[in-house]
Amino acid sequence: MRSGVIAQKVGMTRVFTDAGEHIPVTVLRLSNCQVLGHRTSEKNGYVALQLGSGARKTVYLPKAERGQFAVAKVEPKRKVAEFRVSEDSLIPVGAEIQADHFVVGQFVDVTGTSVGKGFAGGMKRWNFGGLRATHGVSVSHRSIGSTGGRQDPGKTFKNKKMPGHMGVDRVTTLNLRVVQTDVERGLILVEGAVPGSKGGWIAVRDAVKKPLPKDAPKPGKFKVAGDDKVTADAPTEKEGA
C-alpha cells in the first residue's frame, strides 16, 4: 500500500483528446509535499508516513511544532497529514513527492472539505419534494412537512432530516481517473469534480476499489535533496554500501 499526497485545489478546466472530445478536469497542485516523519509498528503500533505541504512562516508556529520540523530538517508546512502505508512503502524523511507518483490512467480517491452553504432548508439540504403548490397550502410550500411524531412515540427521533447547516463536511470522492501529470509544475489533472473550494487542501490516494497499475512506481516517485528522482527500483543506502 503506497502513500498518498497532499495537494491544493487550483480549479477546474478541460482538456481535449485527439478525437476532439473534451474532458472536464480538476487541477491539483503539489506544493513542495515532503515527508516529515515515520510511524512504525514497534513505536506507534501502526505504519504510516507523515507528510507536509505548503509554506508557513516560522513566527506563527508554536515552539513544539518548530521542533518537529527542525528534526525532519524541512521548512514549516501549512498542512500536515498522515497516510497509512505498508512497511515496504516507507519513503525517506525529507524526500519530496513528485506529481508522477500517480500514472496517467490510474484511479485515485480524493478527500477534501466541501464548500459551505450556510443554513439550508430541507429541499436543498436533503432533496425533499416540498408541499403542494395549491389545494390548501399557503406560504409553507418549501417546508419539510410532518416530522413523524404523534402521541406515540411522543418525540422526534435523533438524526431526522431537517433544515440546518449544510456543507463544510469531510467528503471523499472515489475512482477519479488521472488524465495528465506535469512534474515541472507539480500538477495532477483528474477527471471530474473534487470536493472543496479553490485553494482547499486535498488528500489524494490510490483508489481502494480499483487495482493499482503495474507501472505505478513503488514505493513512489520522489526526490531527495541534492539527488535525482528515486523509485523503488533504485538501490537503498545499505544495498549500495
From Swiss-Prot:
Report residue spans for region: Disordered. 139-166, 209-241
Q: Which PROSITE patterns match?
A: RIBOSOMAL_L3
Q: Which GO terms describe its biological process?
A: translation
Q: Which Pfam families match?
A: Ribosomal_L3
Keyword terms? Methylation, Ribonucleoprotein, Ribosomal protein, RNA-binding, rRNA-binding
Quote one Gene Ontology molecular function term. Answer: rRNA binding
Q: Which family does it belong to?
A: Belongs to the universal ribosomal protein uL3 family.
Q: What does this protein do?
A: One of the primary rRNA binding proteins, it binds directly near the 3'-end of the 23S rRNA, where it nucleates assembly of the 50S subunit.
Name recorded for this polypeptide: Large ribosomal subunit protein uL3
Q: What's the source species for this entry? A: Nitrobacter hamburgensis (strain DSM 10229 / NCIMB 13809 / X14)
Name of the encoding gene: rplC
